[in-house]
Amino acid sequence: IDKLIEYKDKYDTVLLYVSDHGESLGENGLYLHGTPYNVAPAEQTHVPLITWMSPGFVSSKKIDLNCLSEHALNRTVSHDNIFSSLLGLWNVNTSVYNKEDDIISSCR
């Protein structure tokens, strides 16, 4: 993020990070990842999703950061939401875009 901040006055920048899986680090005696989803503990199935946007990006895309913060606290999302969210951020017109899967669309 520090590198993106260096360029915030020159470019509209955004970073979206999501881990592909969680990891059990000894909780309940379990040390691993890859447990079948239906029996996997929350440490393996709940992963961080972090988004950082430069002020110029937020302004150009008309994003309401308060709305995004509210959604972050009250909405559960999954990896399934990433694809349409990225398409929506860049206004890519395609039949595979699903507005319901776009976690940012309701905050624009």
Show where each model-derived region lies.
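Catalytic domains that recognize anionic headgroups
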Residues: I1-R108
